[in-house]
Design a protein with these regions (language model features):
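Clamp-loader machinery-focused feature within the broader ASCE/P-loop NTPase space
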Residues: 2-141
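Conserved small/polar residues in nucleotide/adenosyl-binding loops
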Residues: 145-147
Length: 147
């Protein structure tokens, strides 16, 4: 995934890329809706999980890691979004065990999604590199805090 559609994100992408060797435990990427924050986060996750980055450090788009990211199936990346966004963006979504198929798609990130991350975060990376968890939009997590 290239950020060529979002030239205004080049500076933010460069700052993220400069941190890739000494990453903190979490990075909060924020911006107005529609400016490409999700795309920037996906690009950076792909950059971290790329097995053959280009000379400029950008993801190659061709290695197994990049292909798995494009197919939304990289074993070392989890994308946590609402059921509504998962449907709109064609992302994987696992409904809670008590879910009924006739209900309206949830626009909130649900607690069962974070509980499902426990096993993922305690295991070693499958491909030997890093693991990434993208939570989008992060402000949807606040509704969990008030439960």
């Amino acid at each position: 995934m290239a950020l060529t559609q979002y030239p205004w994100l080049e500076e933010a992408a460069a700052r993220l890329d400069a941190m890739r060797e000494r990453l903190p435990n979490a990075i909060l990427i924020h911006g107005m809706p529609g400016v490409g924050t999700f795309e920037l986060a996906r690009w950076f996750a792909e950059r971290l999980l790329c097995e053959s980055p280009k000379a400029d450090g950008s993801p190659c788009g061709k290695c197994p890691g990049c292909r798995m990211m494009h197919a939304n199936g990289h074993p070392d990346c989890r994308i946590v979004v609402s059921e509504f966004l998962a449907n709109a963006l064609d992302l994987p979504y696992t409904p809670p065990e008590t879910s009924s198929s006739s209900k309206k798609l949830s626009r909130e990130i649900r607690i069962h999604q974070f509980r499902a991350l426990t096993d993922f975060l305690t295991m070693a990376p499958s491909r030997g590199g890093r693991r990434c968890v993208l939570v989008y939009p992060a402000d949807m997590v606040l509704s969990l805090i008030h439960i």
